[in-house]
């Protein structure tokens, strides 16, 4: 493979892998991380720290706060995967640590981009529609809880994704 092909593969491979994992819901983000050769560790951390992504001699790794609710852990993992996809060049030895109030060493626009991609990973439009149809639901605020349960996401994350009040 020549240099250009390697660069193109580095850019597009993660998106191809994401789409493969989005064939069914809820999206298996742990398997997605494994497919991308990212190790995942759940750790007992303070409540104000959600997760982190870093790189060491063995490759990329993500740490997720095991004290948070499962749906929050799933979003955090998707968010850190999004950092891998979008900001690999910024992930150094110190990694990127995400807290509720502070995002370390990375700009707010980059955090918003990671949040947006995390939502797209967990709740792509085609899966939203399919989950609604298969569960006999309309995509509206009255059905947020049922649809969030089907997708294994928080009601708040789903409401933001749909642009409706939570």
Protein language model features and the residues they cover:
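Active-site hotspot residues in diverse enzymes, especially metal/ion-binding acidic/histidine motifs
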Residues: 1-166
